[in-house]
Amino acid sequence: MNPVYSPGSSGVPYANAKGIGYPAGFPMGYAAAAPAYSPNMYAGPNPAFQPGYTPGTPYKVSCSPTSGTVPPYSSSPNPYQTAVYPVRSAYPQQNPYAQQGAYYTQPLYAAPPHVIHHTTVVQPNGMPATMYPAPIPQPRGNGVAMGMVAGTTMAMSAGTLLTSHYPTPVAPHQVTMPTYRPPGTPTYSYVPPQW
């Protein structure tokens, strides 16, 4: 046993070696005995609140509103049959059976911002303001040589490179070169401003 920590028995006051003053209501000793355990959450009997669950008590509310039997188990989280509510939507992207990606629609849960701007009337939710067609990606110019298929190696497209059509070369022609003033000291040292 730890000689420094030697708890006293029940009802023995704490050892106050330094004479420290404690506020009113501070427990100056161990409790005589722990309070008895009560299964009630709240003290005192309350007829509206039952103290605990009695085993074998039937449910107050039935699981099924029409009969007292428990509905059969279904792995689907949707309690409604699919045939009762047809899956139909005015927006193709929200319809799981429509062609995906045909149009980009705005799923509207309120009116578009420009409709309710500076107004206090709640506008009805109508058709989307715009239906964007699916964007066509712009052709990107890559750094592949002319005649070479992108994503291939040189060995795969060497025949295409060698046999592809090239324009006929231009015949040599005369090029006139202008005559330049030979370098030297300029004859002027000041250029007047061009007002």
From Swiss-Prot:
Q: Quick one: a GO cellular component term?
A: plasma membrane
How does the protein associate with the membrane? Multi-pass membrane protein
Q: Which residues lie on this side of the membrane: Extracellular?
A: 44-143
Q: Which residues are on the Cytoplasmic side of the membrane?
A: 1-18, 163-195
Keywords tagged on the record: Cell membrane, Cell projection, Cytoplasm, Membrane, Transmembrane, Transmembrane helix
Alphabetized InterPro entries for the sequence: FAM168A/MANI
Task: Locate the transmembrane regions by residue number.
Answer: 19-43, 144-162
Compartments where located: Cytoplasm, Perinuclear region; Cell membrane; Cell projection, Axon
Keyword Transferase recorded: no
Task: Sum up the protein's function in the record's words.
Answer: Inhibitor of neuronal axonal outgrowth.
Q: Which family does it belong to?
A: Belongs to the FAM168 family.
Q: What is this protein called?
A: Myelin-associated neurite-outgrowth inhibitor
Q: Which organism is it from?
A: Xenopus tropicalis
Q: What is the lineage of its organism?
A: Eukaryota, Metazoa, Chordata, Craniata, Vertebrata
Name of the coding gene: fam168b
